[in-house]
């Protein structure tokens, strides 16, 4: 057979689907009970989609196709997300001829150079990648209703008006507030940064440091060294301070809330703190070594402690000033031990080494399993020798901090006897009330980079608009909705619950980037994670909106909040429709149809997306739905999928390690890509794309095509007399139908592929071996039935070649709309499956015996089946499932009693292996019917149950595991 031209087949069926509008559902076709509405997070168009994205979009398409074949009226729409600063940032970097950005777009995304330079205008980036993404989705065979396509921002006014309506509703309900809040901030562009505005670091948490002001006296002047800590309670155990002698520090006037103080902090800290409600005026710059050997006063205990040198202090983390608590901090203990050994460092700074030798550790916390100084014990336990054992030190620190926080009891008055987690809050609060401590926000890691290419800082913003996800009543509604929803996989539910609990105010607008202006404060633009939470409702009416736009019959400015209120929130009213016709210019009957569509499709059945969107988009999706819509319109389910890697490496466009989705289709064909992605991992697990494996799957798919093409020529004559092996294949087909259906209902796409493709392929291979040389009507009937079912089972995964094969099979219409297979009652036959498994297992056992025993030139296989009394033992044990009662019952049988010890051993073995569901078959009959096949497969003469007990093997036979002797 010539090599299969996947591209030609794909183009043929994509064209036919679009021409016939196969995937544009009509709500008049089926009752609401038979509707199925599924959506996936629309892609952000700052570049080409890669094969990781391919998985996110293929999963819902497979489910949509499956439900369509089950007889549901399926809506699977698509739109495009272009909101925010990333696209503007890319345009800016291309304008500035940033080499790395140009390399990504020219070499990784393969944008022609003459088009690349037009990307200085962000609108051209949007147009180019929107066209490319749609082409990719069509080429992938996605069953999208393109009549509902739209994109975000004020560039598409109807959707922008919908977002204005959403925000007016949120504000009306008190969920949008104005105030001060900490946000990620691009200090160059001057804008807050949402998750989607970051090139790197979207998962990096913001830490809240307590900075404690240790006092340094210089003449009459009081200068503060603010030490940053995540453990304010340990201020009682400070033995010294750490400063990096090689880092640059500044003396600065710090003004905050009408109060002015002089601080010494790292140069980097001065910059960061200037964004956090402080005016910083640098007076002097110097190296940290200037401070070494000086003494500062602990503002809580009054102790004077020495400043010691430590190169481990990172000036770019918090204030660059660190307090040392060696009893409870492994790093501090090890650093002091290193200084004791390397006293020449101290001498360099005119510090008497005896000062460090005589430092006394202060025990603060009682911790079960540890003595006075937990940090010291943990360091000894892990065999840490010096600060160079950084990995072990990190481990020790995590262990001690976690244990002390969760189980530690504080020992120092006035907090003695209280749990550490309670004391931590009390001490921090008390210090701040006294003015000896403040808060500083810092990223847990440094790699937080905006899409403009700038390193982010944390800024306290005033007069910023926020969505108040911390509102307790709103949280309660979100929890109620989540409790009613299906979550796939269910293991993700706890994560959603936790996020609902900790979610707080979130900045919802910025002053740069593409988007929809806030309706009441238009200098602010709604950001990308805030305008993408309820657009699934907009899809339900977008077909009508698009048609009106194309016909020039729509004035978006007339799409007032009143219009959206009626469509999405109110009851049907002919009077209201007539009123709105006058106000909007939209005919009343079309307004009525829009409302009908919304009421038909809502609630949304499934929302699909990658697991990275659980902490933001997917949780915001729940919150915004419960805020705006009636309870009967709250979403019903969320399905989450994992990530993709490429040849074992994380995909990264910035490193060029990325495979564009469209390139994967070009190289392999859409059906190969789809099947490969679906076969690699269950939806929540991560997958790894390997080119070699893709090639192997392509050949298997070509074999599938070849087999169905061959079987299409057979005639499926009914009422033929089937042989046992024919019945076996039909039974296995029933199992494949059942297995595929169940897996797809639960979004377990890998299991579905195992059943729909590999299981049938393996069963067919076995059937062809068992029926070699046969070409009768029964075989042709079975293979023709298999072809008809197999093509339909595979259609959600490989729709193009299945359409082609369906046509060859003479199927009616499109396979995409064909009836999903259902098991045929009369095909069920567990007995024949047990019989075939028995034969397969026997062949494997005999081959293994020959190999292990290294039998050269074997001639004969003597096979002994289990005697009747052993079957009885299995049946009794299956009923009793307990040794004593089974033995008591068995010993009533005179025949069985003769085999006393053997019976006891067999009962113990059955119970140990829990082999309670062994199905009885006539082993000898099965063997005699399969004798010719066994001899051909094994190349041996097969002798069944001879009188002679060859090699004394006979007694080893147990049900479904015959004894075998080879000679």
UniProtKB/Swiss-Prot annotation:
Top-rank taxon: Archaea
Enzyme Commission identifier(s): 6.1.1.4
CDD domains: Anticodon_Ia_Leu_AEc, LeuRS_core
GO molecular function term, any single one: ATP binding
Record key words, sorted: Aminoacyl-tRNA synthetase, ATP-binding, Cytoplasm, Ligase, Nucleotide-binding, Protein biosynthesis
GO biological process, one term: leucyl-tRNA aminoacylation
UniProt subcellular location: Cytoplasm
Primary location: cytoplasm
Class of enzymatic activity (EC top level): ligase
Pfam family, one: Anticodon_1
One cellular component (GO) term of this entry: cytoplasm
Sequence motif 'HIGH' region, residues: 43-53
Binding site for ATP: 653
Catalytic activity: tRNA(Leu) + L-leucine + ATP = L-leucyl-tRNA(Leu) + AMP + diphosphate
Nucleotide-binding in keyword set: yes
Family: Belongs to the class-I aminoacyl-tRNA synthetase family.
Name of the protein this chain belongs to: Leucine--tRNA ligase
């Amino acid at each position: 057979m010539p090599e299969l031209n996947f591209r030609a087949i794909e183009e043929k069926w994509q064209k036919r689907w679009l021409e016939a509008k196969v995937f544009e559902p009509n709500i008049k076709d089926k009752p609401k009970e038979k509707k199925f509405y599924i959506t996936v997070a629309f892609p952000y168009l700052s570049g080409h989609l890669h094969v990781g994205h391919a998985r996110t979009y293929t999963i819902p398409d497979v489910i949509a196709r499956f439900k369509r074949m089950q007889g549901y009226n399926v809506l699977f729409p698509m739109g495009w997300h272009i909101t925010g600063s990333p696209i503007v940032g890319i345009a800016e970097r291309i304008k500035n001829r940033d080499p790395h950005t140009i390399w990504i777009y020219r070499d990784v995304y393969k944008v022609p150079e003459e088009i690349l330079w037009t990307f200085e205008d962000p609108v051209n980036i949007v147009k180019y990648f929107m066209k490319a993404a749609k082409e990719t989705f069509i080429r992938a065979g996605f069953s999208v209703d393109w009549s509902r396509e739209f994109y975000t921002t004020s560039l598409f006014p109807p959707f922008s008006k919908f977002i204005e309506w959403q925000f007016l509703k949120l504000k009306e309900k008190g969920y949008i507030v104005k105030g001060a809040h900490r946000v990620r901030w691009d200090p160059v562009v001057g804008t807050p940064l949402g998750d989607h505005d970051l090139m790197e670091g979207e998962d990096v948490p913001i830490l809240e440091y307590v900075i404690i002001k240790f006092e340094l006296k210089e003449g009459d002047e009081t200068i503060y060294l603010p030490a940053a800590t995540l453990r304010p309670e340990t201020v009682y155990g400070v033995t010294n301070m750490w400063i990096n002698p090689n880092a640059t520090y500044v003396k600065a006037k710090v003004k905050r809330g009408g109060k002015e103080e002089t601080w010494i902090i790292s140069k980097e800290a001065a910059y960061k703190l200037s964004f956090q409600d402080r005016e910083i005026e640098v007076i002097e710059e110097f190296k940290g070594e200037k401070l070494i050997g000086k003494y500062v006063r602990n503002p809580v205990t009054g102790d004077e402690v020495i400043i010691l040198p430590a190169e481990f202090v990172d000036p770019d983390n918090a204030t660059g000033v660190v307090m040392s608590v060696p009893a409870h901090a492994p790093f501090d203990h090890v650093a002091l031990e290193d200084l004791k050994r390397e006293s020449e460092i101290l001498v360099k700074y005119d510090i008497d080494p005896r000062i460090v030798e005589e430092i006394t550790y202060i025990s603060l916390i009682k911790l079960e399993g540890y003595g006075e100084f937990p940090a010291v014990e943990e360091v000894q336990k892990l065999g840490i020798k010096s600060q160079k054992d950084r990995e072990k030190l990190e481990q020790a620190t995590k262990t001690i901090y976690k244990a002390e926080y969760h189980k530690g009891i504080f020992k120092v008055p006035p907090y003695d006897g209280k749990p550490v987690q309670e004391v931590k809050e009390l001490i921090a609060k008390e210090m701040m009330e006294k003015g000896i401590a403040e808060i500083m926000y810092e990223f847990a890691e440094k790699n937080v980079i905006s899409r403009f290419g700038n390193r982010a800082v944390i800024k306290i913003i005033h007069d910023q608009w926020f969505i108040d996800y911390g509102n307790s009543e709103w949280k309660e509604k979100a929890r109620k909705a989540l409790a009613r929803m299906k979550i796939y996989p269910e293991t993700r539910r706890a994560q959603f619950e936790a996020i609902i609990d900790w979610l707080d105010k979130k900045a919802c607008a910025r002053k740069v980037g593409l988007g929809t202006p806030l309706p009441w404060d238009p200098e602010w633009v709604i950001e990308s994670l805030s305008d993408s939470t309820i657009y699934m409702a907009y899809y339900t009416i977008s077909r009508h909106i698009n048609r009106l736009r194309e016909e020039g019959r729509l004035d978006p400015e007339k799409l007032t909040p009143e219009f959206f209120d009626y469509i999405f929130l109110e009851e049907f009213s002919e009077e209201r429709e007539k009123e709105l016709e006058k106000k909007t210019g939209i005919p009343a009957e079309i307004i009525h149809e829009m409302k009908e569509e919304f009421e038909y499709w809502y609630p949304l059945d499934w929302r699909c997306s990658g697991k990275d969107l659980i902490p933001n988009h997917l949780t915001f999706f729940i919150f915004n739905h419960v805020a705006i819509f009636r309870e009967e319109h709250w979403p019903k389910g969320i399905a989450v999928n994992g990530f993709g890697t490429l040849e074992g490496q994380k995909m990264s466009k910035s490193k060029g390690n990325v495979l564009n989705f469209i390139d994967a289709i070009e190289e392999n064909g859409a059906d190969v890509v789809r099947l490969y992605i679906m076969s690699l991992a269950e939806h929540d697990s991560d997958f790894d794309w390997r080119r070699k494996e893709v090639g192997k799957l392509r050949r298997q798919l070509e074999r599938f095509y070849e087999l169905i093409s061959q079987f299409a020529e057979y005639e499926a004559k009914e009422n033929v007399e089937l042989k046992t092996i024919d019945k076996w294949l039909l039974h296995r087909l029933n199992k494949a139908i059942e297995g595929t259906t169940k897996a797809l209902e639960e979004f377990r796409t890998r299991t579905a592929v195992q059943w729909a493709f590999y299981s049938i392929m393996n069963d067919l291979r076995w059937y062809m071996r068992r029926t070699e040389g046969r070409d009768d009507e029964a075989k042709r009937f079975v293979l023709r039935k298999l072809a008809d079912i197999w093509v339909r089972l595979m259609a959600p995964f490989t729709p193009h070649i299945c359409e082609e094969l369906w046509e060859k099979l003479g199927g009616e219409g499109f396979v995409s709309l064909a009836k999903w297979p259902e098991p045929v009652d009369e095909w069920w036959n567990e007995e024949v499956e047990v019989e075939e498994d028995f034969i397969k297992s026997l062949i494997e056992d005999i081959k293994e015996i020959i190999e292990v025993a290294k039998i050269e030139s074997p001639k004969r296989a003597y096979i002994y089946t289990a005697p009747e009394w052993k079957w009885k033992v299995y049946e009794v044990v299956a009923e009793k499932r307990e040794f004593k009662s089974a033995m008591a019952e068995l010993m009533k049988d005179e025949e069985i009693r003769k085999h006393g010890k053997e019976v006891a051993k067999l009962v113990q073995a059955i119970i140990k292996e829990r082999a309670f569901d062994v199905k009885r078959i006539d082993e000898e009959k099965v063997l005699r019917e399969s004798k010719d096949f066994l001899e051909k497969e094994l190349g041996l003469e097969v002798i069944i149950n001879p009188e002679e007990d060859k090699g004394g093997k006979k007694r080893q036979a147990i049900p479904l595991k015959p004894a075998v002797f080879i000679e």
